[in-house]
Amino acid sequence: MDSHRPVLLNEMLELLSPKDGAVYVDATFGGGGYSRGILERAKCTVLAIDQDPIASEFYQSLHSQFPGRVHFFLSKFSRLREALQHFDHNQVDGVVFDVGVSSMQLSDPDRGFSFMKEGPLDMRMDMLRSQSKSAATFVNSLSEKDMADVIFYYGGERLSRRVTRAIISARESNNKIRNTSDLAKIIRSVVPRSKANPIDPATRTFQAIRIWVNDELEELKAGLEAASQIVGVGGKIIVTSFHSLEDRIVKHKFNALREKGFQLINKKAIKPTEKEISENTRSRSAKLRGIVKEE
């Protein structure tokens, strides 16, 4: 997977429709794919935000290509208003979100996000390690009930209790589950691979743990609320999500904002084409929604 290949890029740009002289926030900068697309589309400014310090390396490349037009602030997007103060702006013409884990995070085994390569049980998006909980906290400390609930609710894993019992049994016999390979092996031992669904049996549980570690759903709620407060009239909020729970939060928030002077840009979520899915499997579950402030 390529960290420079953002999902639904053209569709996002179509909804955002960047204008010369405008100011946009890329709330999930990552590898800079969305920011690059916006900067190439119009002579505008992008305020880039990301909680992962690694993103600053991609920012340097973009900054040299678009001097004075892109600026970076290390922050969670739930702190959008604080970030805007740092940039000395009160409002913007649009905010874009590409939520969830990035390809560059997945591809680095030292981050612990992937079950494909051995790595530490980490999964913290904030590499400064200001978060107190990690994947190790989850597998080695949570109660059976809490663990099963997280795996079922955040991962949609029907066999959540079976997975939980296997994790609890392993940690009781071995004292600790040491790395992502250990964890993936435990999950695969109790979740059969489906012929109808090609995804790895560990996918849903790893996803659930990542969402729990980073408090992703509450972050998204806070980020959307902050975005609604910083866009001016005509300003847009565009969100690409990858999980049904994320999309539900976006849909619910956008519907609520219709009572506050916002209007949906697209009534139904935009999904990737078969061509994009074949070229970038990460896009398979993506959904894109947009809303504009009309008054």
Curated annotation (Swiss-Prot):
Residues 275-295 are annotated as: Disordered. GO terms for biological process: rRNA base methylation. Transmembrane segments: none annotated. Disulfide bonds: none annotated. This is Ribosomal RNA small subunit methyltransferase H. Its EC number is 2.1.1.199. Belongs to the methyltransferase superfamily. RsmH family. Signal peptide: none annotated. S-adenosyl-L-methionine binds at G32, G33, Y34, D50, F77, D98, Q105. The gene is rsmH. Pfam families: Methyltransf_5. It catalyses: cytidine(1402) in 16S rRNA + S-adenosyl-L-methionine = N(4)-methylcytidine(1402) in 16S rRNA + S-adenosyl-L-homocysteine + H(+). InterPro entries: RsmH, SAM-dep_MeTrfase_MraW_recog, SAM-dependent_MTases_sf. It comes from Anaplasma phagocytophilum (strain HZ). It is found in: Cytoplasm. One of its GO terms (cellular component) is cytoplasm. It is an enzyme of class 2 (transferase).
